[in-house]
């Protein structure tokens, strides 16, 4: 695309324009124009969809859900995701795509998001659901099908259109997902432009422009993308960094704890931000916990093996992408740890004593490499976790394996976390599961601790405006003494 600049001939005889050489359109301008075309189609589709009744909205939700849940398509998406990104494994992605979407459908089933959604006669308040408009959904390579589907379904449930800005590695998987959604929309008589993605190849410039032109941004993925979302000038929800720690106290059932940690840490090769990165084990059960971890496939590295792995996993203080989302056996192979590779480990275990940039195993690893810390008692374990979160992962969540309910309350009151997950496989539980009450989501709000403006699991409420009608009610002015009496009794009036 080019722009032709015209100059007028400086002559008394003619003022006809003379064409000069065509000048190329700058990348930012081209991106803005391309994004504007996509947004215009999304706005037109959303304006029509905003007039739909609840049944039509729920049909759109079901269509998008079935597009990813239908077994043959689910497998295609999982296979494409692994082939394109090189992260995780097919079987676990199939399970994730299905269960996370099924759970979201459960959360949304029967919930009103069109028209009047609540009335309080005593307060004289009527609440009306209103769409936010066009949603820009920024999605990561770690979940290139499940996360986009979750955002699409939530957006549709609230009467919005959505435009995906996937990571470059995940864009082909997103395109395949959209083709499946559009096929279901055609069957249901719904406009395809309700769900779109940026034209490939997706660039940072185009993503930034989409954020600027949309009505709401929901960003999951790198902290760079989250920061860009929060500074784009458009209302935004972004998630915090993971670096989950799990405490094993003296009252824990060790075999159960080890089995759950292993299930969580190995699922999809630990590509989830909710998988455990560190285990903090109290002295009283440290050695038997090591035995329990060994029984479920954990292999403890020697000091020299740990040093070799560290040197290769981090280059210039940055986690090497070649290790992300790989199996433990593959990581051992990449690091040249032949003894470990021959054992076919499920997890690699490394003992650590420090926290911070000089101790990179104390941070998020996005791989089945688990860091072990030893604590003298529960109080020391809490202090250790606090130091981990001061370095990385504040606001996300903490895991506890314990028979002492007071310990869970203590963690909830003292640590900078939005979730305390008790006696569960952490990566399944944090984003909602069928055996806990948390909403199903793949985007975890981390509160102000994690630089976020919400601490919930990202869900349908974040995709909705609410208009409140207030009518007069009988006036009731409280007595000053009723509200300030206790204060006056303590300090005087």
Curated annotation (Swiss-Prot):
One of its GO terms (cellular component) is cytoplasm. The active site is at 273 (nucleophile). Its main location: cytoplasm. Its EC number is 1.2.1.81. It is an enzyme of class 1 (oxidoreductase). It holds the Pfam family Aldedh. It catalyses: sulfoacetaldehyde + NADP(+) + CoA = sulfoacetyl-CoA + NADPH + H(+). Residues 1-10 have a biased composition (Basic residues). Optimum pH is 9.0. Belongs to the aldehyde dehydrogenase family. Homodimer. This is Sulfoacetaldehyde dehydrogenase (acylating). The gene is sauS.
């Amino acid at each position: 695309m080019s722009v032709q600049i015209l100059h007028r001939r400086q002559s008394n005889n003619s003022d006809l324009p003379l064409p000069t050489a065509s000048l190329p359109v700058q990348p930012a301008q081209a991106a803005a124009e391309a994004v504007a075309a996509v947004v215009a189609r999304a706005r037109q589709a959303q304006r029509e969809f905003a007039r739909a009744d609840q049944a039509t909205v729920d049909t759109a939700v079901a269509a998008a859900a079935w597009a990813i849940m239908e077994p043959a398509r689910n497998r295609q998406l999982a296979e494409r995701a692994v082939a394109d990104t090189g992260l995780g494994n097919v079987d676990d992605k199939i399970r994730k795509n299905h269960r996370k979407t099924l759970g979201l459908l459960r959360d949304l089933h029967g919930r009103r998001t069109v028209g009047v959604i609540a009335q309080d006669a005593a307060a004289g308040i009527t609440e009306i659901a209103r769409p936010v408009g066009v949603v820009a959904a920024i999605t990561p390579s770690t979940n290139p099908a499940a996360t986009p589907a979750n955002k699409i379904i939530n957006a549709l449930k609230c009467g919005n259109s959505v435009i995906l800005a996937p990571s470059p590695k995940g864009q082909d998987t997103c395109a395949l997902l959209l083709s499946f959604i559009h096929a279901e929309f055609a069957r249901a008589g719904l406009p395809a432009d309700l769900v779109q993605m940026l034209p490939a190849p997706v660039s940072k410039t185009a993503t930034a422009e989409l954020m600027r032109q949309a009505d709401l941004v929901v960003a999951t993925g790198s902290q760079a993308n989250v920061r860009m979302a929060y500074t784009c000038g458009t209302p935004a929800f972004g998630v915090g960094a993971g670096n989950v720690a799990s405490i094993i106290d003296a009252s824990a059932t060790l075999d159960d704890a080890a089995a759950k940690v292993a299930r969580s840490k190995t699922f999809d090769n630990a590509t989830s931000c909710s998988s455990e990165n560190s285990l903090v084990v109290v002295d009283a059960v440290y050695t038997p916990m090591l035995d329990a971890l060994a029984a479920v496939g954990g292999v403890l590295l020697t000091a020299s093996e740990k040093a070799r792995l560290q040197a290769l996993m981090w280059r210039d203080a940055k986690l090497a992408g070649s290790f992300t989302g790989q199996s433990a056996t593959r990581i051992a192979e990449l690091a040249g740890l032949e003894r470990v590779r021959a054992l076919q480990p499920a997890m690699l275990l490394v003992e650590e004593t420090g926290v911070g940039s000089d101790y990179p195993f104390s941070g998020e690893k996005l791989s089945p490499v688990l860091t072990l810390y030893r604590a003298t008692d529960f109080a020391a374990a809490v202090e250790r976790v606090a130091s981990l979160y001061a370095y990385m992962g504040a606001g996300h969540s903490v895991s506890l394996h314990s028979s002492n309910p007071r310990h869970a309350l203590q963690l909830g009151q003292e640590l900078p976390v939005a979730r305390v997950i008790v006696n569960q496989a952490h990566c399944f539980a944090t984003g909602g599961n069928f055996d806990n009450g948390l909403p199903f989501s793949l985007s975890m709000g981390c509160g102000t601790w994690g630089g976020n403006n919400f601490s919930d699991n990202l869900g349908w409420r974040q995709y909705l405006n609410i208009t409140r009608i207030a009518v007069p009610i009988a006036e009731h002015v409280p007595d000053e003494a009723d509200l300030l009496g206790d204060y006056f009794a303590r300090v005087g009036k």
